Amino acid sequence: MLQTMKTLTLIPARLGSTRLPNKPLADICGKPMIVHVADRAAAAKLGRTVIATDSEEIFKVVAAHGHEAIMTRGDHESGSDRIYEALAKLDPSGEVDAVVNVQGDLPTIDPDTIRRALLPLEDGPADIATLGVEITVEEEKTNPNVVKIVGSPLAGNRRLRALYFTRATAPYGEGPLYHHIGLYAYRRSALERFVKLGPSPLEKREKLEQLRALEAGMRIDVEIVKTVPLGVDTQADLDRARTFCSQAGTI
């Protein structure tokens, strides 16, 4: 159950984005984007919230805004590797049961959406939990940047057991298609196993890290939510986040 599962929320952050340089420090309504994400993650109240970064600049900015950060190596190939290093440093005694990995480019994410990512771990047998939303925009069904979930419905269609993730349009036939949201909750043992696995053939083909877990026989359950949080990858995305902030008065 949630109240007995000791959880750590980690936000990986680096400055190496090529499409949007210095992305975590981009200003949104007078506050760096990574701080907006940390505020949202902390509001979810899933245990301790820590930013894992290889940047001293990010570390200092986060600390100046009252959040905890930890320095990690600069040679990690993925956010999963970075959060595993952070977990080992923050909890060497192994007391943490689950780790929630919140992407550092989701400045408008609802804290309740973050909380929902943990549900498949607290009441089911999944190794890894993540989020999805039904696709309602026709163009997104064929957009390779919108990752689709192929899964078996569980719990009255509010959850899926993931069978595959793909950039193609799938599954074929009548019925809803689901957009994958890249926010994960891992059982500690699952994260430890995942990072020790090498990149898998389908992972490399689709360029989707989560396929490594499925190819290794790990179970991923997907909690269905109502909206896709705004991910900031480009200047246009950043402009949308700033517009949202100015219209809402806050994020």
From Swiss-Prot:
Its main location: cytoplasm. The lineage of its organism: Bacteria, Pseudomonadati, Pseudomonadota, Alphaproteobacteria, Hyphomicrobiales. InterPro entries: Cytidylyl_trans (IPR003329), KdsB (IPR004528), Nucleotide-diphossugar_trans (IPR029044). It is found in: Cytoplasm. It comes from the Bacteria. It catalyses: 3-deoxy-alpha-D-manno-oct-2-ulosonate + CTP = CMP-3-deoxy-beta-D-manno-octulosonate + diphosphate. Pathway: Nucleotide-sugar biosynthesis; CMP-3-deoxy-D-manno-octulosonate biosynthesis; CMP-3-deoxy-D-manno-octulosonate from 3-deoxy-D-manno-octulosonate and CTP: step 1/1; Bacterial outer membrane biogenesis; lipopolysaccharide biosynthesis. Activates KDO (a required 8-carbon sugar) for incorporation into bacterial lipopolysaccharide in Gram-negative bacteria. This is 3-deoxy-manno-octulosonate cytidylyltransferase. Gene3D superfamilies: Spore Coat Polysaccharide Biosynthesis Protein SpsA, Chain A. Keywords: Cytoplasm, Lipopolysaccharide biosynthesis, Nucleotidyltransferase, Transferase. The keyword Chaperone does not apply. Signal peptide: none annotated. Its EC number is 2.7.7.38. GO terms for cellular component: cytosol. GO terms for biological process: CMP-keto-3-deoxy-D-manno-octulosonic acid biosynthetic process; lipopolysaccharide biosynthetic process. NCBIfam families: kdsB, PRK05450.1-1, PRK05450.1-5. CDD domains: CMP-KDO-Synthetase. Belongs to the KdsB family. It holds the Pfam family CTP_transf_3. GO terms for molecular function: 3-deoxy-manno-octulosonate cytidylyltransferase activity.
